[in-house]
Amino acid sequence: MKSSSWQTLDWGALDRLRQRFLEGASAGGDYWTSRADLADYDFTFAQRIGWKWDAVLGELQRRGWTAPAGRPLIDWGCGSGMAGRRVLEFFGMDRFTRLQLFDRSAAAMEFASEKAREMFPGMRVELLGGAGPEAGVPGGGGAPVLVVSHVLNELDEAGGRALRQVIDVADVVVWVEPGTSADSRALIAMREALREQFVVVAPCTHQAGCGLLTAENARQWCHHFAAPPPGLLADGDWVRFGQRAGIDLRSVPYSFLVLERRGLRSPLPGALPEGWSRLLGGTRVYKGYAKVFCCAAEGVHDLMLQKRDAPELFKALKSGEAEPLQRCEREGGRITKVQPFRQEG
């Protein structure tokens, strides 16, 4: 398969694609006018999505969670197939029986299948069809591991029903979206709707209702930040792309949700004991202290962390490299002691 390069990119086509992405579902129709559109997208915009998947998969690894073996992997709303390829690369193709691709665009499915076969020779790759509420619903082969990436702003009512049908037959859902308030709130709504059937693996440290649904947290949302690959910010081609696309490559916000069907595995790999919290995006760092949104089973609270109480965490917050999973002790609205998460063994 012929790949794109910085020398061959069609910048006009990338500008058009960027505008279509911003318009979302209101744009209608197919993004792609040619195979070259998909190749250029995969070389640029999709790489940024890949960094988000790297962050999510890295966290799952730190928690000790891995995908259950012997199941098909479905990349639903696959686009150029970045999400499915990242998952295959991370867990290994031998963990899955096949890769199944679905997208409303036939051209996207063909491109994604070619890229997958190129990267993973011998992997069985299938295209899922269907229309309306049956779109992308697998016909058999076992309960799948379902990956969903950047689809919420494109889904109409029929697409939402179709996705829910696939979720209802899946054993695992790994879902990544942009870190906007709207996308985060939509994922929270899905989390609440699915809590009876699924265990929430991540980003949450608990199984209680989402603390962001309270009136006092109405302006907050659950988002996180992925890091670009080392050295990328010194790469002139990527800098030019970021400027042209209006994207800050230093800040890669995302929201995500990982679910596993209740009773599938006991004990659940990566399950956290009680008492752990998650630091959400939106940290504000000042001289000598920081304000953090801390999510735990008892709710989401805006807390103060003084540098003298946790100098290592304060330094990591300042550099944007803090471990989000922490065990926090507090007095009122102040964190007095922290313990970063480290997987035992």
Q: Would you name each region that the model predicts?
A:
Residues 1-28:
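N-terminal auxiliary segments of SAM/dcSAM-dependent transferases
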